[in-house]
């Protein structure tokens, strides 16, 4: 369940980061602020069972890969070298997810 929170937080990061370029009204900025807040709340909640470094790395990686791919869909240029390094980043994200165990401890450090 906690990895689901990280995944949703990462997807929200893609949405708000991609929206920054197109925001041109107060309502747009309010929505972006809400998306930022919700994404970080979900990320922080995931820290209850997932090591902070792993959760944050996966969160940022999802945001990076997703935002980059969104840029490509919206017509931004890309190269074979960029795609290679994006694939390496994706492999690192998957590795962090696969080799990180969730903690059994409760919030506050009690076991």
Curated annotation (Swiss-Prot):
Keyword Transmembrane found: yes
Transmembrane stretches, start-end: 3-23, 24-44, 54-74, 80-100
Coiled coil: none
InterPro entries membership: Small_drug/metabolite_transptr (IPR000390), Small_multidrug_res (IPR045324)
Domain of life: Bacteria
One Gene Ontology term, aspect cellular component: plasma membrane
Cellular compartment(s): Cell membrane
Signal sequence, renumbered to the chain: none
Major subcellular site: membrane
An individual GO BP term: transmembrane transport
GO MF, one annotated term: transmembrane transporter activity
Membrane association type: Multi-pass membrane protein
UniProt keyword list: Cell membrane, Membrane, Transmembrane, Transmembrane helix, Transport
Assigned protein family: Belongs to the drug/metabolite transporter (DMT) superfamily. Small multidrug resistance (SMR) (TC 2.A.7.1) family.
Name of the featured protein: Uncharacterized membrane protein YvdS
Gene: yvdS
């Amino acid at each position: 369940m906690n990895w689901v929170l990280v995944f949703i937080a990462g997807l929200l990061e893609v949405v708000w980061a991609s929206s920054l370029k197109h925001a041109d009204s107060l309502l747009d900025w309010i929505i972006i602020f809400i998306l930022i807040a919700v994404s970080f709340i979900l990320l922080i909640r995931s820290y209850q069972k997932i090591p902070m470094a792993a959760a944050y790395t996966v969160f940022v990686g999802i945001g990076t890969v997703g935002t980059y791919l969104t840029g490509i869909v919206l017509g931004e240029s890309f190269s074979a070298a960029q795609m290679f390094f994006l694939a390496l980043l994706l492999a690192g994200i998957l590795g962090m997810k696969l080799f990180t165990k969730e903690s059994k401890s409760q919030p506050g450090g009690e076991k």
